[in-house]
Amino acid sequence: MQTFFAPFPALALSLLLLPAAAPSARADDVTPRPVLGEIIRLDPGFDALVPPGAKIEVLASGLDWSEGPVWSAALGAVLFSDVPQNTVFQWKEGEGLTTFLKPSGYTGTNTYSRESGSNGLTFDPAGRLISCEHGDRRLSALSLSGGGGKRTLTDHFEGKRYNSPNDACVDRAGNIYFTDPPYGLPKGPADVDTREIPWNGVYRLTPEGKVTLLTKELKFPNGVALSPDEKTLYVAQSDVTAALWMAYPLHPDGTLAPGRILADVTAMAGSGKYKGLPDGLKVDPKGNLWATGPGGVHVMSPEGKLLGRLETFVPTGNCCFGGPHQEYLYICADAWLCRVKLVP
């Protein structure tokens, strides 16, 4: 186990305990950044992923609930959602934090819900920014080259509005896999007044606009990702009574075969020691899963073996690979945007 804390106790305490203020970020690289949490190494193979001495660097703070990061090669920056602020922020080396898009997920004028903004972000093969939008209850596409604004990709299934699309991933053919839990509804999971679909589904949207319900068996589906060969779909379930990651074999037509539990952290989630539940996840080129969950980011082999954890000590929403050479893991951890250096 390797443990790293902020270089000064007062700074560490402020990172973990002070209420969120206006978002802020460093724009220089002269002074070492504060660090958060600890890195736990559980398998020798972890050193081939995260180099010894790596730290969880804090890039931005003062956020409400950071989520859904994605690296934009075109911008040379990471984009991420602040769901309660209804904003997509951009963080770029040397420039720090700026507002990229507001409103991001709810375009109405009346208060809708506490979590009305965008959540998961990704890019499709055409380079469009795909956004899961809570308040507008849709998937949208935005061209970074300008012109046309946002385009709604889907906002209903069989004539009924989605709950609050949460996370998405895209395959090489442009099919979008996304989850639809109820967290963005005005009353959250307990909402029966505005809810139209009685289940929390996992869906597939084709480039032609056809939507297929893949499964409704999960109580609270959340993060979603594909294996490198696109033959397995991973789905996180953020249910305290069944906190787990599922692995579903994909048929050639995009439908799912019966899934299996890849990893179960129900006991960990219910212990009271760790904050958070299975949430967003990404898969690296070797097939390892980098999955946010109780305590931070769980790094697992394709077989579900836990290799190590990036413990933030706070609820952690999602992560993504980024940098010019994909040399960093960017982490959305509650009020902070962080990153960890990876082995190239």
Q: Locations of the language-model features?
A:
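N-terminal secretory signal peptides that target proteins for export/translocation
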Residues: 1-6
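Bacterial N-terminal signal peptides
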Residues: 7-20
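Sec/Tat signal peptide C-region and signal peptidase I cleavage site
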Residues: 22-26
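Sequence-structural signature of mature extracellular/luminal beta-sheet repeat domains
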Residues: 27-344
